[in-house]
Design a protein with these regions (language model features):
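SAM-dependent methyltransferase catalytic-core segment centered on the flexible catalytic loop
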Residues: 17-40, 105-182
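Conserved S-adenosyl-L-methionine
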Residues: 1-108, 180-182
Length: 182
């Protein structure tokens, strides 16, 4: 179960629904742990939770923008407007290529900052594509699968490759929940 301070990564975050739900859950845990019954937190603390815990990767720029916007809207949901206006030094977090990476999960140059202990939770719904000779736009996945010697990816299914690679980013006690084809 998700606990305060845990790190969550969605390697194919799309519009960010899994990340938004994880962020909401972490905020609710913080509210419960502090006995806060107002349903509101200081914007700086909300920013800290977001930057400490939430990570995502998505190839589509528009989807990355939706993810970042949704996370900021979630932050705003837990702030009273006067508190936000009173804090002149507060700045919204820069998420692009800091916590939300607009890149291919299989790109060897992906700059995803994996915590030293690994991620605590990896959740997502990777694409259910089977690589065939005519499949276009999957050069990084194709190369990663071809170079994979430890674990064979059944039928060149990209979702299975996501599961293998994501599993390697988990910490010793980490858990993954990915929607995969049967």
């Amino acid at each position: 179960s998700l606990q305060p301070g845990m790190t969550v990564c969605d390697p194919a975050c799309g519009s960010g629904i899994f990340l938004v739900l994880a962020y909401r859950r972490l905020i609710e845990l913080e509210l419960a742990a502090t006995g806060n019954r107002t349903g509101r937190l200081d914007p700086t603390r909300l920013k800290e939770i977001l930057l400490e815990s939430i990570y995502g990767v998505e190839r589509q720029r528009d989807a990355c923008n939706v993810t970042m916007f949704s996370l900021i809207l979630t932050l705003l949901h837990y702030v009273k407007p006067p508190e936000l206006h009173a804090n002149e030094k507060f700045k919204f977090p820069a998420l692009l290529n800091n916590r939300i990476f607009c890149d291919d999960f299989f790109n060897p140059q992906l700059a995803l900052p994996v915590p030293k202990r690994g991620f605590d939770v990896i959740a997502g719904n990777p694409p259910w594509i089977e690589l065939k000779p005519e499949t276009k736009g999957e050069a990084h996945a194709r190369k990663w699968i071809a170079g994979e010697k430890t674990t064979k990816v059944k039928g060149n299914r990209v979702a299975d490759a996501f599961a293998v690679k994501a599993g390697r980013l988990l910490g010793d006690e980490g858990v993954a929940g990915l929607l995969l084809p049967a």
